[in-house]
Design a protein with these regions (language model features):
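Conserved Walker B
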Residues: 63-64, 164-168, 196-198
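Pre-Walker A (Motif I) flank of P-loop NTPase domains
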Residues: 54-58, 85, 136, 190
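Walker A/P-loop
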Residues: 55-74
Length: 348
């Protein structure tokens, strides 16, 4: 028996009404056919995301390897079952295909990766709102969402999932253009933020992530600094915990060892003596990287690329070989271009 969209939405609403937002029954129907082995902490995290209907979102901050993508998939499946299908996933560009495969293969949720080429094709075809697609989840990169912020802001999203959300932790700084642009574009939308590292260097990063979801939680930046400047006081720390409890959920690896058999790894120390040729390669590359005039590396990226090259050099000769080949090709290309310019100048 097939249901119309209206009937399906009505039945989903009835099921939701009968089940409390923090009950397992709320998710049971939505993930009945999912190809995943669920762990208790994943179900708990998904239910947490539903717990407060007045909340503007949630921050799921489980440690690395505990399945935050699965937790998000549970939330997406329930929203899909409720016919709330205007869903956007913002993720680093290199993770777009991974999200596409996970949602397709494990939760049978249709997805579309939206990038420049299909976006422009949609515009040429007369679809002037490429983000507003029916019955498919839209996946895009941070940069693309930032570039198309006006489209993102004008789309009535039911849910926005933001992966690797620690990229937004400095949103309180005006210099973080991407984070501030996305915050403004998504200010009235329900958001689900995923990150394993909600706090790295400063408590202000936690303020940034929470304010991205709901600015009312901590107030403005100056109020936050004044209230939580001294976490050594038990009372202040307790207040911070209470403020975070309704919006942030975190599970640690040590809390799930009862049902997840993590691989036990042992570090072994081995002595390594480089050969004479390897020593010479190291010295030559180091000398090259110390040059004042280094044409192969862009001036604005020199420090970062030097660090990367030194890591490759410390790894193995095979690791650095590919990078050195690329640098050589880049220099040859510059020389050919320069020769062409000089040839044209002579003719003129």
């Amino acid at each position: 028996m097939e249901f119309t969209d209206y009937q399906a939405k009505y039945f989903a609403w009835e099921l939701t009404k009968r089940s409390p937002s923090d009950s397992l029954e709320k998710l049971a129907g939505a993930v009945a056919n999912a190809q995943v082995d669920l762990n208790p902490h994943q179900v708990d995290a998904a239910l947490f995301a539903f717990r407060s209907p007045l909340s503007r979102g949630a921050l799921l901050a489980d440690e690395v390897g505990l399945g935050k993508t699965i937790e998000a998939g549970l939330v997406l499946s329930q929203r899909w079952a409720e016919r709330k299908r205007r869903i956007l996933i913002i993720t680093p560009a290199n993770l777009r295909k991974q999200w596409y495969q996970e949602l397709n293969e494990k939760f049978f949720l249709p997805c579309t990766i939206l990038e420049t080429k299909p976006y422009n094709a949609a515009i040429r075809a007369g679809q002037f709102k490429p983000f507003e697609v029916d019955d498919t989840i839209v996946i895009c990169s941070y940069q693309f969402a930032r570039n198309k912020a006006a489209d993102v802001a004008n789309t009535p999203w039911d849910l926005v999932v933001i992966d690797e959300a620690h990229r937004l932790r400095n949103v309180y700084k005006p210099t973080n253009v991407i984070a501030n642009t996305l915050k403004q574009a998504l200010k009235d939308r329900h958001k689900l933020l995923l990150t394993a590292t909600p706090l790295q260097n400063s408590l202000l990063e936690l303020f940034g992530l929470v304010s991205f979801i709901d600015e009312r939680t901590f107030g403005d930046l100056s109020s936050f600094k004044e209230q939580f400047a001294n976490l050594n006081q038990a009372r202040v720390f307790g207040i911070l915990q209470e403020r975070l409890r309704p919006i942030c959920h975190r599970t640690l690896r040590r809390q799930v060892t009862a049902y997840i058999p993590f691989t036990r790894r042992h570090a072994l120390l081995e002595e390594f003596t480089p050969e004479e040729s390897e020593d010479r390669l190291y010295d030559l590359v180091s000398e090259y990287l110390r040059r004042d005039n280094l044409q192969a590396l862009p001036a604005g990226q020199r420090s970062l690329m030097t660090l990367v090259l030194r890591k490759l050099l410390a790894s193995s000769t095979f690791a650095i070989a590919g990078a050195l080949t690329s640098i050589a090709e880049r220099l040859k290309k510059k020389l050919r271009k320069q020769a062409l310019v000089e040839s044209l100048e002579e003719e003129l």
